[in-house]
């Protein structure tokens, strides 16, 4: 569980000990996946400049692929034959480019959410 106050206390201790200005240390937030937006914002306010999100991004990709499977399940059981007819082809449904695209769309959505959470949208 993320406890951002530890970051603030660390900044304060370093500032007092070494006579620096405010927020003398830039922090990297390892293991940020699954953190609440309010905790992320608090951590940023205490000097976090980088946050690792790999687990959230992996899950987002999988969730997109899994959602595609659930939606198209009846078209993914055989090469030919689906609810539209026993002789109807399913190639366009099991083509990896199709279901991988669902994963890509899902991960893009999650990345946008992460950028918003991290106050990193439209920053050059």
Predicted feature locations:
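Extended, intrinsically disordered, low-complexity segments
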Residues: 70-124
């Amino acid at each position: 569980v993320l406890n951002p106050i530890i970051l603030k206390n660390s900044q304060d201790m370093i500032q007092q000990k070494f006579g620096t200005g405010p927020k003398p240390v830039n922090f990297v937030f390892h293991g940020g996946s699954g953190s609440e937006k309010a905790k992320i914002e608090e951590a940023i306010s205490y000097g976090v400049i980088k946050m690792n999100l790999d687990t959230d991004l992996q899950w987002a990709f999988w969730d997109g692929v899994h959602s595609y499977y659930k939606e198209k399940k009846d078209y993914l059981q055989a090469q030919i034959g689906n609810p539209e007819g026993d002789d109807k082809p399913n190639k366009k449904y099991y083509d990896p480019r199709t279901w991988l695209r669902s994963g890509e769309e899902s991960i893009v959505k999650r990345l946008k959410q992460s950028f918003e959470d991290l106050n990193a949208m439209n920053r050059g």
